[in-house]
């Protein structure tokens, strides 16, 4: 609460509430959990702003892609800078996400969600010894396991559908390849390609499968594929036309694109509105493109 109180002045300039920084921090772990964490914000308007913008901070499903691309394309000096430059690039990506969150919050305050920021009154309760058992139970059972089970329930069917699309052929090409060719012009227009867009679409249920799906499409294996080393991954991607600029574009698109299905379901549950769920989908998608 003290951190939120200290940052309230900054967030108030964007028309948001200081407690939004806490839901953003939860979003770094899981955006669905971050959306649920927005319940701590009392003002309905500011709570809705926090819910809509929570996806603009990278979750643990998007961090692996960002980290591996930074390691593959920014560690090329052969010196101690190979550890510093990727770390700086990841930090910059996170800062872009935080900046986008504040910018979108400001725009929402001036357009769809007009209003005056509420007052943040910090109450200091008496210090008490933490109830370790209760905290562990709440964190593991009520939150972590619940979110993981819900994510697994959505991701498993998506993996099966992706496998089918990659193994059902129309002519000499699979349906997945036909779809990638169809999306190729749009992908090229934003510095990506059709296969990258297909991978992100396939990753709608779970962002963790974006890179395996992309490698599957590039290598035409018909099964989710992993890579043996960073060097082998870089060679695969560069042989398919990737450059450092492509890697930067993919990292930014991963940061800013639409929420995963679990997050959208959570937004629908928290807001009870299809309109605001659609807004939470279309706003980051528009920013990403």
Q: How would you describe each model-predicted region?
A:
Residues 40-44, 57, 65-76, 111-121:
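Flexible glycine/proline-rich, aromatic-decorated loop/lid segments
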Residues 28-34, 53-70, 91-101, 205-211, ...:
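Membrane-embedded alpha-helical segments of transport systems
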Residues 5-12, 46, 76-81, 276-278:
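Membrane-interface alpha-helices
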Residues 14, 20, 34-50, 159-285:
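Extended, low-charge hydrophobic alpha-helical regions
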Residues 2-36, 114-139, 218-232:
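Juxtamembrane inter-helical linkers in multi-pass membrane proteins
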